[in-house]
Amino acid sequence: MRILKLLELVVKVSLFTIALSSVLLAFLIFRATDAKVEIIRGDHPEVYDDSAENEVPTAASIQRKAILETLTNLMLESQTPGTRQIREGESIIPIFAESNTQKTISVSDLPNNCLNASSLKCEIKGVSTYNVYYQVENNGVIYSCVSDSAEGLEKCDNSLNLPKRFSKVPVIPITKLDNKRHFSVGTKFFISESLTQDNYPITYNSYPTNGTVSLQTVKLSGDCKITKSNFANPYTVSITSPEKIMGYLIKKPGENVEHKVISFSGSASITFTEEMLDGEHNLLCGDKSAKIPKTNKRVRDCIIKYSKSIYKQTAGINFSWIRLILIALLIYFPIRWLVNKTTKPLFLWYDLIGLITYPILLLINCLWKYFPFKCSNCGNLCIITHECTKICICNKSKASKEHSSECPILSKETDHGYNKHKWTSMEWFHLIVNTKLSFSLLKFVTEILIGLIILSQMPMSMAQTTQCLSGCFYVPGCPFLVTSKFEKCPEKDQCYCNVKEDKIIESIFGTNIVIEGPNDCIENQNCAAHPSIDNLIKCRLGCEYLDLFRNKPLYNGFSDYTGSSLGLTSVGLYEAKRLRNGIIDSYNRTDKISGMIAGDSLNKNETSIPENILPRQSLIFDSVVDGKYRYMIEQSLLGGGGTIFMLNDKTSETAKKFVIYIKSVGIHYEVSEKYTTAPIQSTHTDFYSTCTGNCDTCRKNQALTGFQDFCITPTSYWGCEEAWCFAINEGATCGFCRNIYDMDKSYRIYSVLKSTIVADVCISGILGGQCSKITEEVPYENALFQADIQADLHNDGITIGELIAHGPDSHIYSGNIANLNDPVKMFGHPQLTHDGVPIFTKKTLEGDDMSWDCAAIGKKSITIKTCGYDTYRFRSGLEQISDIPVSFKDFSSFFLEKAFSLGKLKIVVDLPSDLFKVAPKRPSITSTSLNCNGCLLCGQGLSCILEFFSDLTFSTAISIDACSLSTYQLAVKKGSNKYNITMFCSANPDKKKMTLYPEGNPDISVEVLVNNVIVEEPENIIDQNDEYAHEEQQYNSDSSAWGFWDYIKSPFNFIASYFGSFFDTIRVILLIAFIFLVIYFCSILTTICKGYVKNESYKSRSKIEDDDDSEIKAPMLMKDTMTRRRPPMDFSHLV
């Protein structure tokens, strides 16, 4: 009976279990389950699939609508198995309930999991200078988040390097590699909003959107004005900004200043240190950039303090040398006297110093007898006098040669008494320390220490809103109309603006004020605008701006930012503010805005020719051709070189100056852009799991994206089941992965098409001032001279067809680089567009690219090892071509400067012979024009173009009041003349007259009126009123070591000018020969003088007496008197 009841119970339990399992299995067949995502990044292995069907040549060609899915607990409860669908970029998500009515909610109304990171599982994926990228998991779903605040993220994984707060200084991305080394102030995560196939849901701060995340290099942004410059000690600059917060810093190109940006509000004063005045640093403040001029602080301080005395200026400037001379004199006289007088009272000091330096003293004393120029019995150094002092090395009272045998140090006897003691004994210590040699050394050390103490105490130097009519406004960043009392964005409109065809009506809510005005809107704006604020934006800003307002909202309006320094339009300003909000809408527009540079930090002084360091040469003409003097000039093709030629003729009165300066020499490369590559900073993964079915079943809910997709099947079998899923050998997990690229470290890959040697040559002097590009392919030619390059073979490591990389440091690299669409395992993957969109990657991931795991009962997990190709780590194998940074021109060419000679520059100058003749009459100058553009009292000066017609060929001097000129002499030819002249003026030369003096003759002078002067005072540090800058420059020019060296060689210019390109070499040879000749004659003169003094010849001469007394007095005056050569004269015949 008991057995039957037991069997009955077993059958009932079995039937109940089967029924329950069937119900659960039937329920789970129609219900999908979500899985947890796990992401691992690092130096992971790549597995390449060379099959054609696994490669995506162009990702941009695969267009797909945006997927906008924000999964919440509400949706998971109410969503049916068929509701995971593809949306067409909509921001409204339908929620299907049991009723027939459809409910819609906004994405922004859904719960924000990113803001609840402290209570959810989260992981920090990347930390930039200005924000953080992290991922949050909720109910098995991973959410990507970017935040400008670190609040609430302390408990997240990998939060050790998370700062307590991020800087709020406004920044925008830098997309041009050439500008990164100049303006980079760190990195920031940006969201690229797009409708391409590679987007995914992201939340920036509290604003959900769709797009991709990338890490970009950033620069400062904002309105900043340099209001004052005081380049006298202290060297300060005052800056102001109308924005609530602004950033500035001092940056040297290429320097890492990621965490050195200083924020300020209102105004700030910057004091430059001496290191910042080296001419290599720039001041970056918002949109503005200013080059800090090279200033010798020591020279400038002395010039300012002693501006009325050149002698005091010289003493102050060279005080660093004078103070050393003063210390040397102090050591040699009073300090030495003091040390000699206190040797006995300070015996403990000398014993202490001797104890510290005992090994050195022992070594010197023992090796003293092997030293040259020494006195063996005294131990003193004898170079000049060759005389020994009276004190012996072993402290004998008098010096004697016998002392050498008695002194243990100099003695050669082996059985000396001191040999019984060790070198470390007290006997040897007293002997060594008290020798004359040791004692002199200890006193010298004491003198140096006292001198250093005195030296340390000596001074180092001697010396936009949009208005309806009156009180109703649109403020960027606020979607409602506000009044003039606007403080923060309200929840609804505070006023009303009605734009009609012929008038505009404005009314302020809560008041009885209604204002009417004429319709003065922007014309030809054809777009629909229904709400009041849309009508106002269309009226004042246009349809393009309205489209941005509707589709690209501003989360932070930055109402104080105007973008005036960059000259931004209303649309450009809106886009710049979007960039400040961390959103990139268009790469091309971002590249345009970030490429705008306000200031002179990238400018170079194009007209500056360092004449003070250039050698001078008298130029002799080679021949006369068609009435012209032909000069053949040949110079080494080396950047920074040049020569000042002085042209002269017997018939001319003054020499003509002709300057050739080779500004730079290098190779111009034409290239073809291939792609951009960058490291993978992190990875975003999304996948979906089904209990039954296969990949096709899974893809109905998780559609293919076109690249980097994956699917694993089967995923349901014994030992690998989720709760309430009992399927066997069924199920699938499908999804996709997307990379977050670090564009801050991106490289652009180019293919070399052509290389040409190019020289930038500047000509100044009688031909005016001009700089020209001369290539090895086409000679340069104008009316007066021809230039040609004779190039040597150059091997710079770059060949035609080779792939090169342009790095974020603006340097060029070569090596093993993968070609476009080539999956070879070399540097060059991932392959991207400029804005970080993949253009070649894997279509589907293979099993080796990821790992899949599950539990007996639980959710499945996937680990992504490699999301596409990644070989960026092979960049260490690249070789840097040059130490000089390069700039690309329209991504099609660049110039690589060389620091060595690339050949010869040959110039043929044909000057009319009339230039060397005195003008017979006053020349007729007609059709004159002199137009200038530039700044006053600045380093750039006024760039002027002088044009006129002349009836004569002549040479003329030029001058103008209150201005100094880049050249003071011009070669005028008959007919049309045009010259480029730079003028540095202290006052506006407009409507003044420039005077021409033919052959320097004021009697036949001609005046040319200055027609037009456009003064553009740039707002930077260099172009401020600085009355001492010219004095400093003049002093530096006059005191240049190169200028002094050239002055010494100048007497030999005439002879050396006959040797052409060997001009400078011949001058050095002649100078050395002259020095040896002078030394030879001086040695002869010295020998004669020594003999004269030694023989006392000055005592052998006396006043010549009468002939009658000479015989008597001669023996008393001279020794060895010579006999007379003729007898005395006989006068007897006269008697």
UniProtKB/Swiss-Prot annotation:
Entry-linked InterPro entries: Bunya_G1 (IPR005167), M_poly_TospoV (IPR014414)
Stored Pfam families: Bunya_G1
A GO biological process held by the record: symbiont-mediated perturbation of host process
Location of region: Non-covalent dimerization: 177-195
Keyword Nucleotide-binding found: no
Swiss-Prot/TrEMBL keywords: Disulfide bond, Fusion of virus membrane with host endosomal membrane, Fusion of virus membrane with host membrane, Glycoprotein, Host endoplasmic reticulum, Host Golgi apparatus, Host membrane, Host-virus interaction, Membrane, Signal, Transmembrane, Transmembrane helix, Viral attachment to host cell, Viral penetration into host cytoplasm, Virion, Virus entry into host cell
Regions annotated as coiled coil: none
Cytoplasmic side: 367-484, 1089-1135
Glycosylated residues (UniProt): N116, N210, N588, N605, N980
GO cellular component term of the entry, any: host cell Golgi membrane
Transmembrane intervals: 315-366, 1068-1088
Region feature Signal for signal peptide peptidase, mapped onto this chain: 437-484
Endpoints of the signal sequence: 1-35
Lumenal side: 36-314, 485-1067
Family of the protein in this entry: Belongs to the tospovirus envelope glycoprotein family.
Further facts: Tospoviruses are transmitted from plant to plant by thrips as the insect vector.
Record-given protein name: Envelopment polyprotein
Protein's organism: Tomato spotted wilt virus (TSWV)
Lineage: Viruses, Riboviria, Orthornavirae, Negarnaviricota, Polyploviricotina
Name of the gene: GP
